[in-house]
């Protein structure tokens, strides 16, 4: 049965198109523009590399801990559900969810901090902007242009992942100069759903992994205002449930509560502001997709709790320091010895110093955790994270 979209949903038939005209010579199959965007993401090398990029745990001891790839799939599942209920475009939502983490360097935020420092005199590094740089420049499988030539709506949604942008960095400015994305306005509801779905998945699945790893205490978790009502509901329904099944039920229930809260709040905002069409969404005074005030407050408190108790856990810090060392040494090595770069990266060696620094960071940022260690062993010497 064909979905009846809301009047303010993104419509592939009304897409602003792609930067490069692809013509009609190739067989496209029965796919609309946003479905093709999604498929290009899934078939990209950058997407495949997410399998070996860290979510929380570097060099995890268990095969069940999440990585960027599994996180992206979970974000997409949540995003499609929310989009379906709100009668938005599921295909664009899914594509944005799948692509949102492509710009993460090896070892996650640890690696990002090193790359920011490496480019401090060349415009800095931001993983959100780097996602777009990958998709518009670095990932280049086509014969007539660089990048995946994604739709305007896809690029806009990735650029404004967290809302309007007043001061874009160099990487985002380059994309905007080539294909103006109206950076100071709000993105589509589909992009807003993707961002919220990332928060829901991030909070719950990192909690799941942290509990399973024994790094955070369940009693402290269930005392958090975000989790306490869910815990009470689960314990009332299943008073004898323990262990892994108890954690699984807690996570399942918490995701549902956050999804339902976001649906109620988004409907309330739409009813109040009364947008008719997609251009109205872009000119709204605030995001249309979001949590209630209480959920927003509790979710922020929970993030603070997770940073203190999980992301900066003493067991993780020594590995994080070693990972930082690996990335910083690799950047320094290729800066001093660019001939150690792969041949295709040497062939595209820039003429000026700023672009050379960015070129090296592009290469290192594209590495997986595994490949960064492999290149360190190959080019510098033996080194173990744990």
Swiss-Prot record:
CDD domains: HDc. One of its GO terms (biological process) is dGTP catabolic process. Disulfide bonds: none annotated. The keyword Aminoacyl-tRNA synthetase does not apply. Keywords: Hydrolase. Residues 68-203 form the HD domain. PROSITE patterns: HD. GO terms for molecular function: dGTPase activity. InterPro entries: dGTPase, dGTPase-like, dNTPase_2, HD/PDEase_dom, HD_domain, PHydrolase_assoc_dom. Belongs to the dGTPase family. Type 2 subfamily. This is Deoxyguanosinetriphosphate triphosphohydrolase-like protein.
């Amino acid at each position: 049965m064909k979905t009846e979209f809301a009047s303010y949903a993104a419509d592939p038939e009304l897409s602003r198109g792609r930067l490069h005209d692809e013509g009609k010579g190739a067989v496209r199959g029965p796919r609309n523009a946003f479905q093709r965007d999604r498929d290009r993401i899934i078939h990209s090398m950058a997407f495949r590399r997410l399998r070996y990029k860290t979510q929380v745990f570097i060099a995890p001891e268990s095969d069940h801990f999440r990585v960027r790839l599994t996180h992206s799939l979970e974000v997409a599942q949540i995003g499609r559900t929310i989009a379906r209920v709100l009668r938005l475009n599921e295909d664009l939502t899914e594509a944005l969810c799948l692509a949102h983490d492509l710009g993460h360097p090896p070892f996650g935020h640890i690696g990002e901090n090193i790359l920011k420092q490496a480019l401090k005199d060349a415009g800095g590094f931001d993983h959100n902007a780097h996602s777009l740089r990958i998709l518009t420049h670095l990932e280049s499988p086509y014969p007539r242009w660089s990048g995946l030539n994604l739709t305007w709506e896809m690029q806009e949604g990735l650029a404004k992942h967290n809302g309007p942008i007043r001061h874009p960095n160099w990487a985002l400015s380059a994309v905007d100069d080539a294909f103006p994305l109206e950076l100071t306005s709000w993105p589509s509801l589909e992009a807003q759903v993707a961002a919220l779905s990332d928060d829901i998945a991030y909070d719950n699945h990192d909690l799941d992994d942290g509990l399973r790893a024994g790094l955070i205490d369940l009693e402290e978790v269930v005392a958090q205002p975000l989790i306490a009502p869910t815990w009470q509901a689960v314990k009332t329904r299943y008073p004898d449930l323990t262990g892994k099944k108890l954690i699984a039920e807690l996570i399942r229930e918490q995701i549902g509560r956050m999804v339902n809260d976001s649906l109620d709040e988004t409907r309330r905002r739409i009813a109040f502001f009364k947008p008719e069409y997609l251009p109205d969404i872009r000119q709204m005074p605030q995001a249309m997709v979001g949590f209630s005030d209480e959920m927003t407050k509790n979710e922020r408190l929970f993030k603070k709790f997770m940073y203190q108790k999980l992301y900066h856990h003493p067991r993780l810090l020594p590995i994080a320091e070693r990972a930082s060392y690996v990335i910083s040494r690799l950047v320094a090595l290729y800066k001093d010895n660019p001939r150690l770069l792969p041949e295709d990266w040497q062939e595209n060696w820039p003429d000026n110093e700023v672009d050379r620094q960015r070129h090296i960071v592009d290469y290192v940022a594209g590495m997986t955790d595994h490949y960064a260690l492999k290149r360190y062993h190959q080019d510098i010497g033996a080194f173990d994270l744990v």
